[in-house]
Structures are given as C-alpha cells and as structure tokens.
Amino acid sequence: MGTLVIFKENEMTVLEDISEETYLNMKKESADLQEEHPPYLIWHEDLHFDYGY
C-alpha cells in the first residue's frame, strides 16, 4: 500500500492506502483518455505504517 498524489491543472489530490496495482491502472486509464493536459500521478510505497511514510 502507498500514497498517491495527483496533480491536474491547479488541483492536487492525495489518496492514502492505494495499492501499486490500482496506481498502475489509474495511470493507464489516464493515458488512454488522451487529454491535452493529462494529470500527473505519483505513487510512493508506505514503508512505516505508523507514520504514513
């Protein structure tokens, strides 16, 4: 599990407890939409669950 950060235009969204598989699916779906300005997605694995990083 990890944390996903999505940047789209002037917005930032943070989603916690996201699996790497879900991240890869979201990234693929985003690329398939072929938007002029697609969202930028970053996923980072949570290594220490008590502190969220």
From Swiss-Prot:
Domain of life of the source: Bacteria
Protein name (record): Uncharacterized protein YkzT
